[in-house]
Curated annotation (Swiss-Prot):
Protein family according to the UniProt entry: Belongs to the bacterial ribosomal protein bL35 family.
Keywords recorded for this protein, A-Z: Chloroplast, Plastid, Ribonucleoprotein, Ribosomal protein
Record flagged with keyword Transmembrane: no
InterPro entries registered for this protein in UniProt: Ribosomal_bL35, Ribosomal_bL35-like, Ribosomal_bL35_CS, Ribosomal_bL35_sf
Pfam families, alphabetized: Ribosomal_L35p (PF01632)
Subcellular location per the Swiss-Prot or TrEMBL entry: Plastid, Chloroplast
GO biological process: translation
Organism: Guillardia theta (Cryptophyte)
The protein's name: Large ribosomal subunit protein bL35c
Entry's Gene Ontology molecular function annotations: structural constituent of ribosome
Length: 66
C-alpha cells in the first residue's frame, strides 16, 4: 500500500494539542487592525479548538500528525 500524502496547506494551519484536539489560529488578525479595539485584537491572539465535525476531514488530510 502506498504512503498517504499530507495536505501541506493543512499542515501549516493546524496542530494537535496535548489532549489530542486540533487547534488553529483565529481569522481577522493579519491586517486592517487600526479600527479593531485592543480587546478584540487581544482576544484574536488566542488559539481556537476545531469543531468535532471537522476532525475526520483533518485526520484524512493529516494522516501522520501525532
Amino acid at each position: 500500500m502506498p504512503k498517504l500524502k499530507t495536505r501541506k496547506s493543512a499542515r501549516k494551519r493546524f496542530y494537535i494539542s496535548a489532549k489530542g484536539k486540533f487547534v488553529r489560529k483565529r481569522a481577522f488578525k493579519s491586517h486592517i487592525l487600526e479600527k479593531k479595539t485592543s480587546k478584540r485584537k487581544r482576544n484574536l491572539k488566542r488559539k481556537m479548538i476545531v469543531f468535532k465535525g471537522e476532525n475526520l476531514a483533518l485526520k484524512t488530510m493529516l494522516p501522520y500528525l501525532r
